[in-house]
Amino acid sequence: GNDYHLPDYSRASGLHVIDFTMHHNFETMSNAWNVACPENDKYYNDATWNVVYVDSHDYAPNGAPEDKRYSKPQANWAENLSLMFTYRGIPCLYYSSEIEFKKGCTIDKGPNMPLRESGRAYFGGYLKGDIQGVDFAHYTSASGNVGQTWSHPFAQHIRRLAAIRMAVPALRKGQYSRTGCSGSCCFKRRYTDATTDSYALVTISGNATFAGILNGQYVDCV
């Protein structure tokens, strides 16, 4: 539950995978959470290298529906993002999902639909303007269209999640466990190396109780 072990990379192929298992089930966070269980990690040398995403230029999750850009309520999107940035794998965001661009639009119909009406429409205009960055996921000012883009609640949610993930090594590289975790979606993650011992307790959209945790001082990252 709390221990980290170094994966046997000598047995790795060097090719990591897109996490289709989670993608297909991201209609809701709970669906993805239930299917991405520790018992399935035996199929991967190191599941922290899986590329995890909700929607793409081809498909949304099953039932979302698949042929349209993700159209579920904002609360669903926010939960999906929270799980993506804290659970196994590397989060991958499809361009413009941070503002729900073309939400619910058909993703692609080839020559039978103008590109501007599809989910693959041009997004560059939303990035016009100036932004002054000071550090990873932090900026002091943003003007023009990009300023409006950055002000979207999802863009800010992603920015905060990225900053939290960067600050906590366990959320990037740690193995996870559900042992001693009581709640709808909660887990422990730990990562150790010669200079690092990072440990995190995570719950998504709900209360949780953790048992058998490591001694020490716990700090709220959110």
Where are these regions (language model features)?
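Generic hydrophobic, helix-prone segments enriched in Leu/Val/Ile
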Residues: 1, 26-30, 163-165
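Substrate-binding cleft/loops of secretory-pathway carbohydrate-active enzymes
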Residues: 1-24, 102-112
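Core domains of carbohydrate- and sulfate-ester-processing enzymes
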Residues: 6, 17-42
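Residue-level detector of intrinsically disordered, flexible termini
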Residues: 11-13, 31, 210
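Loop/helix patches that line or flank the sugar-binding groove of alpha-linked glycan CAZymes
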Residues: 17, 34-35, 44-216
